[in-house]
Amino acid sequence: MKSNYSTYLYKMSELERIVNGGDVSSIFIEQDDVLGEIKNFNYDLYTKYDSLVLKDPQTQNNSPKPPSLEIFILVNLIALCGRINDKFPNLDKFLTHYKYATNIFNLLSENIINSIEKFKETLSKDLPSFQLSVIANSSIVKKDNSIIKFLSCFGSFMKLESIEYFGSVFNSLIGEEDQFSLDLLQVLIDSSNEYKKFLQILEFNQLQKYYDDGHLCLFHSIKFDNLNEFKLLFNDSTWCQQQQQQQQINPQIFWFILCKYNSSKIAHYLLNDYQINKKSLKQKNPLEISPVTLLEIAFLCFSDKIAIVLFSQFNYHELLPKKSKMKHLIKSTSTLINNNNNNNNNNNNNNNNNNNNNNNNNNNNNNNSKNIGLTQYTVLEGYFLINIRTRSRIAPFIEVLTMNGIHLTNDIIHTRIKSMSSDSIFRIFTEQYQQQQQNPLNNNQKQIQFNENFTRQQKIDFDNCPNEIDTFILDKTQCNLITLSQEFSIKVRAFTFYLSFGEIFTCSCEDYKREFSCKHMFFILLNYYHVPRNSYLIYQRQFTEIERYSIIMNIDLSKINSRIYGTPNFNTFFKIKSSPSSTTSPFQSINNNNNNNLNNNNNNNLNNNNNNENENKFKEDGDDEILQNLNRLNYILLRDFEFGPNDITTKLRETHINLFDRLLLIEDNLEALDKILKNFTQKGCTLSRDLVGDRNLLVLVAILDSTSKEKLSLLNKYWPLPEKTKKFAIPLIFFAISEECLKMFIQISPNLVKSTLNLHDWISILTEFALINETFLDHYPLLSAWYSDARSVETSLFRLFTCMDKIDCINYLIQTYLLPIPTFKNTLNNFETCYFFETYFLENSSIKAEQYLLEQELLEKKKQKEKKKQKQKQSKSKIINNPLSSSSSSSSSPSTSNTTITSTTPTTTTTTTTTTTPTTTTTTTTTSSPKQKPITPIKKEIEKEFEKIELTTPPPPLATTKQQQINENYDISIGKFKFNRKEENVLGRGSNGTLVFKGIWNNRIPVAIKQMQKMFNPLISKEIEVLITLTNKNCYNIVRYIDQEEDESCVYLGLTLCDGSLQNLVEKGDNNLTLTQFLGYDINSSSKNNSRLLELIKDIVYGIQFLHQQGIVHNDLNPRNILIKDDRFIISDLGLSKMEVTSSYSFTMHAPTGQEGFHPAEVLLEKRKTKSVDIFSMGCILFYLMTGGQHPFGDKFYRIVNILTDKPILEPLKHNLVACDLISQMISKNESDRPTIEKILLHPFFWNHEKKVKFIDASLNLFKDSNGLFTSKLNKLINYQEINLKNNIDSSSSNNNNNINSNVINNNNNNNNGMATNIPFLSKPWNQLIDQTLIEHIINKQNQLNGVGNNKKVIIYSFDQVKDLVRCIRNTIQHHKEIQRLVRQSPSSNGDNKQEVLDCLESQELVLSYFEEKVPDLLLFLYQKFKKHLDSKSLIYFNDLIIK
C-alpha cells in the first residue's frame, strides 16, 4: 500500500473522529490520492486482519468490528462527491469528474462491487442502520456539503426508507433554517417523487402521526417558523383536489397550529404573498378565514407575534364590537365565517353580510344618537388556554392589544361552553367527541362494574384498601367539580382535570382518618364518572394555599339553592392521564365528519349516528385536550349523572374561570397581571372595574405571601384598593393577619386603625368565602363566646389581633401608635395594652365598657365554677377525715356511709393537706384581677384534660407503710406533684434556673418533674402547647407529657421518669451499666453495625422523624437529651421545640441551651433554625454513640472552630465507612446539603439484606439495559473512584485486608478542582479476593445455564470489571443452592476451605454477608456513583433505593 489513510477511515475510532468534527473528504490529504488510496486498499485483507486482532485478548477491547462493505463504499463515495465543485451534481457529472470511476472498484477484492451499476443496486437495498446513523448525524451536525452532493448524485437510487432516515435526522437536529438545511431539504425532495409526496402531505391526521413518529413533515417548519422551508413543503394542490371531492379541510385547525407555535413569518406570508398569488391565479384560498376569528384563535394561544401581523393587516377597530359603561353593546359584527359552503353560497353570504353591515351601521348611528357623550371602547372577548408554551406569551400579547387600543373585558373566560360560536374551533372538537362517545352506563351497571374497576387499576397500591366500599355514600352535592386546567403537547398523549370532593365525604379507612383523603376517592370517581378504561388516576396534592383557596372561590356548578363549599383540609385533587391504544388522530376524526361538525342543521342528529362510526375511539391527544375534557365531562354530567331520583343535574356549562382571576389568584405571572391591569384601565376605561370583588381581595389579603403582596400593590397602582368590602362594608384591614398587609392598608388609610366591626359580620364573611372551617372558633374561646352571644358584639382591631394571638401585628401597632404616647408604659400586658389603645383611638368609645363588662362576666362565671368545684372537694375531704360526721349523715346518704367504712386510714391527714394545696393554688391563679390577661385556649384545654383524668382515675389504694414513707420523703406538694429539693433528688439542671427533680404524680406514679421559672420564659404556654400536641400522638420515641402545675413563680411539668441518659451511659455509666453492657458487645471491636446498635439508632431517628412530621424542630439535641427507658432510647427536653412556621419565628430567637459542639454553624451564627439543625445534631450524636463518646469535630476546645470552618474529623469511624458516609452528609456545614429525615432512612446504613439484594438486582438490570443507559463512560466511572487528597480519613490505615481501597467517603462532595485523583476501585482482580473453590463452581454453574458442555470451560467474567463482580454476586445469590450442591459433590483437596464455602451458601443472606466481608465497600461505592452520575431515566431502575 502507498499509505494507510484509507485504513484509518474504516476504523470505528476514525469514524468517531469524523462525527466529532472535520470534513469526510479531509481524510484524504490530496484530491489525486483519493482514487489511488481506494484502488490500493484490499478490503478482504483488512477484514481478515481485524478478525485476527479481535481474537487477541490484549487488544479486543480497543479493536471494534470493521464497518460493513456497503458503508465502506458509501463513505468513500461521499468523500468523492465532496470533491465535485457543482452545488447539486448528478451522476453524469460525477462520472465526468472521475472518468475512471467505472473501474474504481475493479482493483479491490472479488467481494466488492465492481461497478457503479452494481453499487446502485446495493443502494436500493437496506443499509446497516447504526452505521448509516453515524454518517447521517455526523454530516448534518457538521453541515458537511458532501452529503448534499452525494444525495444529489445517488439519492434517486437509494431505498425510500434510507431517504426517510435522513429526513428524520433532519427533523431532530435542524432547528432554525439556513442555507445548508434548505439545500439538504431540496435534494431530499428531488431524490424521490414518492418521498416528495410524503413530505408535502397536508392531511392533518397523517401529519400528526408522522410528527409523533419523528418524521420530517410540515409541522417542523411551523414549529420553528422556517418560512423558506414551509414554502418547499407546503403544496396546496392536495387541498384543491379535496375541495373538488367535497372533503374540504377546515382552515381553523391549520391556523390554530400556526398560532400555537406563534409562527409569525409564515402567517405574514399566507396573509400577503400567498393571498395575492391566489387572487392573481383566480383560485380559491383554502386558508381563508375571518380576521376576527383569526384574532380569537391567536388570543386562544396568546400568539403575540401573529397578533402584531394581524394588527398590521386589518383595522380591528372596525371589525370588533364596541362597549360603553352605560350602554352594554354598541356595535356587533359577525366574527366567524363558514368555510363549508360553495362559491355561490359564499357570494350569497357576502351579500347578506353587506346587508347586515348596513343594518349594523344604521343601528350604530341610532345608538350613537341616543348615547351622545358616552365613551366607546373596542373590546375583544374570547377564550384562553394557559400552558407551558403560552404562559410566557401572556404579557406580550396583552401589550400588543393595549398598544393597538383593544380592551379586554370580563367576558374573557377559560372553560365556558355556553356561548361558543357555531363554527368555532371549540364546536368542531366538542361535537365530534359527542358523536363518538360510547353509550353511558346506568347506576346498576356501574355498581356491577365497581369491583372490576377497584381491582383493575394497576397504578394504585391496593395493600391497605378495605375489601368493601359503600359505593352509595356519595351523592350529587358531594361532587364539587372545581375547575379544569391543562398542559398541552402534541407529542404527549395526556389530559388533566381536577376534582374536589365535598366536606360530607367520609371513609372508614385509616388514611382518610389521618389525612382526610384516601385512595377510595379514586374508585368512586371511576365508578360514577365512567372514566375510559385506558385511563388511570394519579393522586396530586401539590398546590399552594392560595391555589387551593382560589379554586374554591370558583365553585359555581349547580343551580340548587344551597351553597356547596369545600375547605383546603378536605380537597382532593385528581390527575387523569390517558394513553389510548387507538391510532386515530383527532384531526382525522374531525376531517372524516367535517360536514356534520359544521352543519348547524344537524345538531339534533348528533346522537343518531351509525354504530360503525362510533367504533373508532376518539383519541384524546394534542392541544384540543381541554376542549375534549370540557365536552366529555359536560356530556357525562348532563346525560349520565344518575345519583338518585329527582336530583338536579350538575351542569358544567356554568363553570368558568376568568383570565383576570387566573392571573390574580393562581398564576405567579406578575408581568402579565401588570399588562392586563394596564389594558383594563387604558384611556380611563372602567368596563372591568367590577372584576376586583370581595372574593379576590379577601383571598389575597387573608393569605398574604410574597407574590400576593406584589399583586395587591399592582391592584392599588391601577385600581386603588377599597377600604371596606362591598357586601358587608367591613374594613379590609380586619382581614390583614400579617404585618406586611397591615402596613399596606394603614398606608392607604391611616384612620382604618380607629375602625370597629361587628364580630357576627366578620365571621359570616369568612364562612361564606370558605376562609375558615368549622373548627376555627374552637381555637379562640373568647371569639366563640362573643359569636354565641345574641347581642351585637363590636370589637377593635387591636382586640381582635390580641384574641387571635397575632403578635407581629400587635407589636407593629404598639410601635407605631402607642410608643410615641408619653403616658404609655411598655410593661403593660396585652389586655391592659388593648384597653389603653381603645381609650385613645376608638371613635366609638362606648364599646369599651361593653367589651369590658362582657369579659368580666366570663371571668366571673369561671370564678364561680372553680369555687363550686373547690367546695365539692372540701366536702369530700371532710367526710374522709371525720368518720363521725359521715356516720351522722348516713341516714340521708347511703353512698356516704359506704365511703366512711372504706376510707378509715391512718393517712387521711396527709391526703387532705396535699389535696387542698393545689386547689388553693389554682384558685389563686384563675381569680386574678380584672386587668389580668384572659384565660388562654391552651389553659382551657389543659383544664378539660385534668377533669377527664379526675373522672376516670380510680381511687388510690389503701396506704401502706412504704407509701407513707414515700410521702414523708417528698415534702413539697405542687398540685398533684410531690418531690423534695435535696441534691440526691435532682436529676438534672438547665439554663435560666431550670431544674429536674425525681417525684411522684397522683401519690403513686413516679415521674420526672421539670421546674421552670416564669420570669425567664414568658412564652411558656407555647411550650405547653407543643407538649400537648405531642401527648395526643402515638409515638414511643419521645418523652411523654403527663401533667402540668404552677405556683406564683414557676411552672412544673410532669414527664416520663427514665433510667438515665446517653451521656451518663457513655461517660459515667448509669447504675453501674456501661455502654458495652448496654449494647451487648464492644462497639470498638467490630466494623459491622450490630442489630442492637441499629435498633437504638432507629429509636433516635424515628423520634426526630415524628417531630418533623408534626412541623416541630427540637433545636437542642445532644447526648444528655437522649434518655433510656425500658432499654430503648427516647428523646427528651423539648423545651426549645418550636413549630416550624413563620409566625413562630419570634419564639425561636433565643440561643439554644444544650451542650457545645452539637449545633451547626447557622445556630452558632444566630441564623434561622430549620429542621436541618436537628439533622446536624443527630449526626453528631450518632458519631458519639458509635465511637463510644468521641465527637466528629474533635476535642471540646476546638469543636466550635472546626464546625464553623467545616473541618470534621471522622478518623475514629474509619472502620465503618457506610456510617461515615451518612454522618458526613448529616454534619455538612451547608444546611441545604444535609439530607431530610426521610432520606436518612433510605441510606444504605439502614438497608437490610432484602434491600441490598434488591439494589444488586437493580444494578444488574441497569448494566443490561438495551436502551443505551449504561454507557462506556458510566462503566469507567464505576471502575474508578475519586479520592479527595484533603480527605480527613487516612485511606492507608483503613480496613484493607483485601487490598481494596476503602476510601469512598466524600465521593458525593468532590468538586474535581485538581484536589482529587482517580484510582481503581479494585486494586487487583476480584477473583483473587474470593475463595477459588467458590469462583470455580460459580463459573461452572453459569456454563451449565448457558448450555456449555462439560468438557469446555468459558470464562464469562472480566475480573477487573466491577459490573462483572456485581453480576457474579447476583448469580451466586440467585443459584446459591445449586452452587452449594456442586461444591458438596466436588472432591476436597488440601488447603481448601470447602466447609467455609458451603456454610456461606446456606442462604441468600449468608451469601451477601460473605461478599460484604470480601469486598466491604462495594455497595456504598456503587450507591455513591449512581446517586451522583445517573440521570432520572436510569434512576427508575432503583425506585426508592436512590433519591437525589
Curated annotation (Swiss-Prot):
Organism from which the protein derives: Dictyostelium discoideum (Social amoeba)
Family as reported in the entry's similarity comment: Belongs to the protein kinase superfamily. Ser/Thr protein kinase family.
Substrates-to-products reaction catalysed: L-seryl-[protein] + ATP = O-phospho-L-seryl-[protein] + ADP + H(+); L-threonyl-[protein] + ATP = O-phospho-L-threonyl-[protein] + ADP + H(+)
Upper lineage: Eukaryota, Amoebozoa, Evosea, Eumycetozoa, Dictyostelia
Uppermost EC category: transferase
Coiled coil: 593-620, 847-879
Xref: Pfam families: Pkinase, Ribonuc_2-5A
Region (Disordered) residue spans: 335-370, 584-619, 864-938
GO cellular-component term (any): IRE1-TRAF2-ASK1 complex
Domain spans labelled KEN: 1279-1444
Disulphide bonds in the chain: none
GO MF terms, alphabetically ordered: ATP binding; protein serine kinase activity; protein serine/threonine kinase activity; RNA endonuclease activity; unfolded protein binding; zinc ion binding
CDD domains: RNase_Ire1_like (cd10321)
EC number(s) stated in the UniProt entry for this protein: 2.7.11.1
Catalytic residues in the record: 1116
InterPro entries: IRE1/2-like (IPR045133), KEN_dom (IPR010513), KEN_sf (IPR038357), Kinase-like_dom_sf (IPR011009), Prot_kinase_dom (IPR000719), Znf_SWIM (IPR007527)
GO biological process terms on file: IRE1-mediated unfolded protein response; mRNA processing
Transmembrane segments: none
Positions contributing to ATP binding: 987-995, 1010
Keywords: ATP-binding, Coiled coil, Kinase, Metal-binding, Nucleotide-binding, Serine/threonine-protein kinase, Transferase, Zinc, Zinc-finger
Biased composition (Basic residues): 864-876
Compositional bias per record (Low complexity), positions renumbered to this chain: 338-368, 584-613, 885-937
SUPFAM superfamilies, sorted: Protein kinase-like (PK-like)
Protein name: Probable serine/threonine-protein kinase irlC
Renumbered zinc finger spans (SWIM-type): 495-529
Domain Protein kinase: 981-1246
